[in-house]
Amino acid sequence: YHFKNLTGLIEAIQLTRSAQTQEKRAEQIEALSSKTTQPSVREICSLLVQPAFQLACENTDYRCYIKAFGHKLILTDASPAEMAASHGGGGVSGKQASGMLKLALPHLDAAAYQRRIDAAVRLCSTSMYHQARQKNAFSGDQAELFLHSLVDALVGLFSAAVSPQTQALADKLK
């Protein structure tokens, strides 16, 4: 491995881990698609976090990656979903999961969906970053409880109706 500078090394690490996540998500989408043509919101939300969680369970280097870079999407001033996409995050499998999620959430217009997906990326990034720093973070019942609680939170985040207050402010800002 020859990199001209530290930035090049960091980008290579991020692209490698992103590719691993995309591949794992693609496997999970294929398994889900073979099971049902209309997955639940919970099953789709699981696609947002379970690939990274499983990789962290299986791979020490991936856990180190989460510890080192998990905070980056939290601290961005830009859309964290767009930032993740611009760094190779998501890929084809991420676009598939996003498309499935949009279809399952007809109550959200494009702007509301974008606000929710940004909040979801921040929630997942924060949660995984914190979890990676815990003892036995990705093994045992406590780790499974973490995963299922995070998926529950994502389901709530996406399933909630847009409040009249939020809609009024969104309309005002158009």
Model-derived segments and their meaning:
Residues I13, S40, I44, L48, ...:
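Residue-level detector of well-ordered alpha-helical segments, enriched
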